């Protein structure tokens, strides 16, 4: 039995939720997000809460209910506060800048890397070695951050590369002669 699914999602002021069968649409001050819930999950909406439960005849129904509850909670937080992911670049000559809907990266390759941002994701560069991604969809923000990090992930000897701001890179000792 899922402890996560037992807790209802409380809707804050200014958030509208529409349930249409298994489809959930959350609308708030920062935008609108939609999700199709798994068939094993029963969704019920009271005044300002949404509760989740299992449907009979499905294995792992409580697990699916917990997953859907977490996704809906992330949607509610996303349309009210939004999500932020911060990346830092470490290395000589590693730079980033934002031009419109593109993040331009200089990462030591023979060519600059241009990463197109999907809709709903905004990027800022407070400095040449920092990228701040913001948006309403937590999954999309995390995926964009992972894609940018994958261009040049931190190497284990000097730690050069693109890393998350809170990431700690374990460095190895160089080979001794």
Curated annotation (Swiss-Prot):
Protein name: Large ribosomal subunit protein uL6
GO biological process: one example: cytoplasmic translation
GO molecular function: rRNA binding; structural constituent of ribosome
Family to which this protein belongs: Belongs to the universal ribosomal protein uL6 family.
GO-annotated cellular components: cytosolic large ribosomal subunit
Lineage per the UniProt record: Bacteria, Pseudomonadati, Pseudomonadota, Gammaproteobacteria, Vibrionales
Protein function: This protein binds to the 23S rRNA, and is important in its secondary structure. It is located near the subunit interface in the base of the L7/L12 stalk, and near the tRNA binding site of the peptidyltransferase center.
Transmembrane segments: none
UniProtKB keywords: Ribonucleoprotein, Ribosomal protein, RNA-binding, rRNA-binding
Gene name per UniProt: rplF
Entries under HAMAP family matching the protein: Ribosomal_uL6_B (MF_01365_B)
Superkingdom field: Bacteria
PROSITE patterns on file: RIBOSOMAL_L6_1
Subunit structure: Part of the 50S ribosomal subunit.
